[in-house]
């Protein structure tokens, strides 16, 4: 999975010149970082998506010499929920994973705020279901990396949109806007 984003201004989706405005998943989050499916290195989605979180977790398991409650979970069964449960159970590798992910995501959100100054940012998807494990370090990093004039002014919150409705509602909104 990747990391999608959209920018809503005055209730309308910002499309840009060719319909691809708001590709936050492909901003450079880590110089010379992980290879992304788009061909670039260090894209935000290689760190802040469900797959990125899995990769960070495996790096943390290696760093902490396999001292993890989920270290033996097969890659095909490893997901954000398994890592979340491990973090809540006190797993140091899983907790570090959320801290690192939140730091990177928060820094990129701060950059986005600097050039767009939104009133709110809504996060959505599997990793966001972990709640404060991801939201607290993300918010802390975002605020730390903001210029003082922007601090404590942008709401960062999980979307309340049901996961099962997201794709159809997004597609419907695009059709309605074209009518």
What is each of the regions a protein language model found here?
Residues 20-32:
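A short, polar/charged loop-to-alpha-helix boundary motif
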Residues 13, 31-35, 40-179:
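ATP-binding/phosphotransfer module of carbohydrate and carboxylate kinases, centering on a glycine-rich
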Residues 1-2, 20, 126:
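A short acidic Gly-Thr/Ser loop motif
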Residues 4-8:
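Short beta-strand scaffold segments in enzyme catalytic cores
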């Amino acid at each position: 999975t990747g990391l999608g984003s959209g920018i809503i201004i005055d209730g309308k989706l910002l499309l840009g010149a060719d319909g691809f405005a708001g590709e936050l998943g492909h901003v450079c989050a880590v110089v010379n970082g992980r290879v992304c499916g788009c061909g670039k290195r260090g894209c935000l989605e290689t760190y802040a998506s469900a797959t990125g979180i899995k990769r960070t977790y495996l790096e943390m398991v290696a760093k902490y010499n396999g001292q993890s409650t989920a270290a033996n979970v097969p890659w095909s069964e490893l997901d954000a929920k398994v890592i979340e449960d491990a973090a809540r159970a006190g797993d140091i590798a899983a907790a570090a994973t959320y801290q690192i992910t939140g730091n990177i995501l928060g820094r990129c959100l701060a950059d986005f705020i600097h050039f767009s100054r939104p009133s709110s940012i809504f996060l959505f998807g599997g990793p966001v279901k972990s709640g404060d494990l991801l939201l607290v370090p993300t918010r802390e990093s975002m605020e730390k990396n903001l210029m003082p004039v922007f601090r404590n002014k942008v709401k960062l919150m999980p979307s309340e949109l049901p996961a099962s409705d997201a794709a159809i509602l997004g597609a419907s909104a695009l059709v309605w806007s074209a009518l």
